[in-house]
Protein backbone atom coordinates (compact mmCIF):
# COMPACT_ATOMS: atom_id res chain seq x y z
CA UNK A 1 0.00 0.00 0.00
CA UNK A 2 1.21 3.50 -0.86
CA UNK A 3 0.16 6.99 0.19
CA UNK A 4 -1.93 7.67 -2.91
CA UNK A 5 -3.93 4.48 -2.29
CA UNK A 6 -5.13 5.53 1.18
CA UNK A 7 -8.83 6.37 1.51
CA UNK A 8 -10.69 7.90 4.43
CA UNK A 9 -13.00 5.77 6.53
CA UNK A 10 -16.66 6.32 5.60
CA UNK A 11 -18.38 9.24 7.37
CA UNK A 12 -15.14 10.39 8.97
CA UNK A 13 -15.01 13.57 6.87
CA UNK A 14 -18.72 14.40 7.02
CA UNK A 15 -18.63 16.10 10.44
CA UNK A 16 -19.43 19.78 10.09
CA UNK A 17 -18.79 22.15 12.99
CA UNK A 18 -21.85 23.99 14.29
CA UNK A 19 -22.10 27.61 15.38
CA UNK A 20 -23.64 27.70 18.84
CA UNK A 21 -26.28 30.07 20.18
CA UNK A 22 -28.12 30.79 16.90
CA UNK A 23 -31.67 29.63 17.67
CA UNK A 24 -33.49 26.37 18.42
CA UNK A 25 -33.52 25.23 14.81
CA UNK A 26 -29.73 25.11 14.60
CA UNK A 27 -29.52 22.26 17.09
CA UNK A 28 -27.27 24.18 19.46
CA UNK A 29 -29.43 27.17 20.38
CA UNK A 30 -30.71 28.41 23.74
CA UNK A 31 -28.09 27.19 26.25
CA UNK A 32 -25.46 26.48 23.58
CA UNK A 33 -24.32 23.17 25.12
CA UNK A 34 -23.54 24.88 28.44
CA UNK A 35 -26.21 23.15 30.49
CA UNK A 36 -28.71 25.12 32.56
CA UNK A 37 -27.52 27.54 35.24
CA UNK A 38 -24.31 27.96 37.19
CA UNK A 39 -20.97 29.66 36.89
CA UNK A 40 -19.86 27.77 33.78
CA UNK A 41 -23.09 28.70 31.97
CA UNK A 42 -22.35 32.43 32.23
CA UNK A 43 -20.44 34.44 29.66
CA UNK A 44 -17.44 34.91 31.98
CA UNK A 45 -17.84 31.56 33.64
CA UNK A 46 -14.39 30.12 33.12
CA UNK A 47 -12.30 30.21 36.29
CA UNK A 48 -8.67 31.21 36.37
CA UNK A 49 -5.84 28.73 36.73
CA UNK A 50 -5.49 27.58 40.35
CA UNK A 51 -9.06 28.61 41.34
CA UNK A 52 -10.50 26.34 44.03
CA UNK A 53 -14.08 27.60 44.29
CA UNK A 54 -13.42 30.47 46.69
CA UNK A 55 -11.23 28.45 49.05
CA UNK A 56 -7.80 29.99 49.56
CA UNK A 57 -5.78 28.42 46.75
CA UNK A 58 -2.70 26.32 47.32
CA UNK A 59 -0.31 28.90 45.89
CA UNK A 60 -1.47 31.37 48.57
CA UNK A 61 -1.48 28.84 51.42
CA UNK A 62 2.19 28.00 50.94
CA UNK A 63 4.87 30.42 52.17
CA UNK A 64 6.82 32.61 49.78
CA UNK A 65 10.42 31.68 49.06
CA UNK A 66 13.29 32.94 46.95
CA UNK A 67 13.33 36.72 47.07
CA UNK A 68 14.01 38.12 43.60
CA UNK A 69 16.07 41.16 44.62
CA UNK A 70 18.40 39.47 47.11
CA UNK A 71 21.69 40.73 45.72
CA UNK A 72 20.55 44.07 44.33
CA UNK A 73 21.83 46.02 47.35
CA UNK A 74 24.96 43.93 47.75
CA UNK A 75 28.25 45.66 47.00
CA UNK A 76 29.94 43.95 44.05
CA UNK A 77 33.67 43.92 43.25
CA UNK A 78 36.03 42.88 40.51
CA UNK A 79 38.22 40.47 42.45
CA UNK A 80 41.88 40.36 41.39
CA UNK A 81 44.04 37.51 42.63
CA UNK A 82 47.75 38.12 43.18
CA UNK A 83 48.52 34.87 41.29
CA UNK A 84 47.02 36.21 38.06
CA UNK A 85 48.44 39.70 38.49
CA UNK A 86 51.96 38.32 39.03
CA UNK A 87 51.75 36.40 35.73
CA UNK A 88 50.97 39.62 33.81
CA UNK A 89 54.50 41.02 34.44
CA UNK A 90 53.33 44.59 35.05
CA UNK A 91 55.11 47.30 37.07
CA UNK A 92 51.86 49.13 37.89
CA UNK A 93 48.38 47.65 38.07
CA UNK A 94 45.51 50.08 37.44
CA UNK A 95 42.11 49.79 35.81
CA UNK A 96 43.58 51.11 32.55
CA UNK A 97 46.40 48.54 32.45
CA UNK A 98 43.98 45.71 33.25
CA UNK A 99 41.68 46.81 30.41
CA UNK A 100 44.69 47.05 28.10
CA UNK A 101 45.74 43.47 28.97
CA UNK A 102 42.05 42.38 28.60
CA UNK A 103 41.83 41.08 32.15
CA UNK A 104 38.64 43.09 32.72
CA UNK A 105 36.10 44.53 30.31
CA UNK A 106 36.01 48.20 29.33
CA UNK A 107 32.31 48.29 30.29
CA UNK A 108 32.98 46.93 33.78
CA UNK A 109 32.64 49.84 36.23
CA UNK A 110 32.81 47.78 39.43
CA UNK A 111 35.47 48.67 42.01
CA UNK A 112 38.69 46.61 42.13
CA UNK A 113 39.57 44.42 45.11
CA UNK A 114 42.95 42.71 45.46
CA UNK A 115 43.13 39.37 47.30
CA UNK A 116 45.56 36.50 47.77
CA UNK A 117 48.80 35.85 49.63
CA UNK A 118 51.16 34.79 46.86
CA UNK A 119 54.79 35.88 47.33
CA UNK A 120 55.69 38.41 44.65
CA UNK A 121 59.20 38.33 43.20
CA UNK A 122 59.17 41.88 41.81
CA UNK A 123 57.73 45.01 43.43
CA UNK A 124 54.42 46.06 41.88
CA UNK A 125 52.47 49.30 42.40
CA UNK A 126 48.68 48.76 42.76
CA UNK A 127 45.84 51.28 42.45
CA UNK A 128 42.71 49.57 43.77
CA UNK A 129 39.63 50.44 45.83
CA UNK A 130 40.07 47.65 48.39
CA UNK A 131 42.74 45.13 49.42
CA UNK A 132 42.77 42.17 51.79
CA UNK A 133 45.20 41.97 54.72
CA UNK A 134 47.07 39.01 53.24
CA UNK A 135 47.43 40.73 49.88
CA UNK A 136 48.66 43.93 51.55
CA UNK A 137 51.31 41.97 53.49
CA UNK A 138 52.41 40.16 50.32
CA UNK A 139 52.77 43.44 48.38
CA UNK A 140 54.65 45.17 51.21
CA UNK A 141 57.09 42.26 51.69
CA UNK A 142 57.98 42.47 47.99
CA UNK A 143 58.65 46.22 48.47
CA UNK A 144 55.64 47.13 46.33
CA UNK A 145 53.08 49.85 47.09
CA UNK A 146 49.31 50.15 47.25
CA UNK A 147 47.27 53.28 46.57
CA UNK A 148 43.66 53.08 47.75
CA UNK A 149 41.37 54.93 45.33
CA UNK A 150 37.99 56.15 46.54
From Swiss-Prot:
Function in brief: Binds to the 23S rRNA.
Residue ranges, compositional bias (Basic residues): 10-21
Alphabetical UniProt keywords: Ribonucleoprotein, Ribosomal protein, RNA-binding, rRNA-binding
Gene that encodes the chain: rplO
MF GO annotations: rRNA binding; structural constituent of ribosome
SUPFAM superfamilies assigned: Ribosomal proteins L15p and L18e
Family: Belongs to the universal ribosomal protein uL15 family.
TM annotation in the entry: none
Source organism superkingdom: Bacteria
Name of the protein this chain belongs to: Large ribosomal subunit protein uL15
Pfam families attached to this UniProt entry: Ribosomal_L27A (PF00828)
Subunit text: Part of the 50S ribosomal subunit.
InterPro entries from the UniProt entry: Ribosomal_uL15 (IPR030878), Ribosomal_uL15/eL18 (IPR021131), Ribosomal_uL15/eL18_sf (IPR036227), Ribosomal_uL15_bac-type (IPR005749)
Gene3D superfamilies: 3.100.10.10
NCBIfam families for the chain: rplO_bact
Organism: Mycoplasma genitalium (strain ATCC 33530 / DSM 19775 / NCTC 10195 / G37) (Mycoplasmoides genitalium)
One GO cellular component, as annotated: cytosolic large ribosomal subunit
Entry keyword annotation includes RNA-binding: yes
Chain segments carrying region Disordered: 1-49
Single GO BP term: translation
